[in-house]
Amino acid sequence: MKKLSLIFAALIAAPTAFADTKIELTGNDQMQFNAKTLEAKAGESITLSFKHIGTLPVVAMGHNVVFLKPGTSVPAFAAKCASAKDNGYLPTDDESKAMIVAATKLLGGGQSDEIKFTPTEPGAYPYICTFPGHFAIMQGVLTVK
């Protein structure tokens, strides 16, 4: 009977052990994310829904969300992004690609994108918009516990 109770308890706990964190983030024409801090648990799948709630087109006021590995120098990474227009302002060199945990598409006003990723290690994961000049204002931190 004890074994059956343990199995039943494990089955009840299983769905919460692997719960999916859902995050809704927006960016606007004033170069602002609606959240500067986000939280998740290590090993937990994150579904990020990102919407550009402004009206300006992608060529004038494009926004994305790029999550970087803990310890990444945001200014150095953003400097490489500025010259990567043909790739949605995401650098293509191996060193930079290794710093990226997850990234949405570059969006214009009214557009949205959804990504899924799973941070496996605890830490402070910076996130930024890589459109030229935006990272100085459009950045935050995903704290993974």
For the regions a protein language model found, what residue spans apply to each?
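Sec/Tat signal peptide C-region and signal peptidase I cleavage site
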Residues: 15-19
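Aromatic- and Gly/Pro-rich amphipathic surface segment
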Residues: 70-104
